[in-house]
Amino acid sequence: MSEDLTFEERYQKDIRRRESFFSDFHLTDYSNYLGMKDTDELQTKGYVVYIADGYITEYILRYFDKQYAVIDDYLYYVLIVKFMGGFKVFIYEYSYGKLLESDLSDYSIFEKSIADINSLISSCYHIALSLSHTFFNITEYYTKYISNFK
């Protein structure tokens, strides 16, 4: 189990899973559905791509007072869309090599103020330093993969 791995081993495994996620992701129709074309558009229009392990996704759900069982070994695709009054959060599950919209009809869209999302990211930062990203550097970190979206 993941408890037996050293931090470095888990970190490298996580990087490989994220790379595999994006390799599969850009071949789906989700990129068109989400309207993502490149990192410039992501930054100017405010789409934020966040890839998280199960325990971070669980923390995000708890932040919104939602109860949903997540699986630690799965990756979750969290799309944060900013708009003038706040933001919305969409959660997708990535498992068995497939991207699935989680069956979270009551959970998958949330609205909060911009101050709340900054607080959330700050809290994630303290819980898991290596998995937390600001709005700006998450797009920088995955530029190579996001730029493949057509």
Swiss-Prot record:
It comes from the Viruses. This is Uncharacterized protein ORF150.
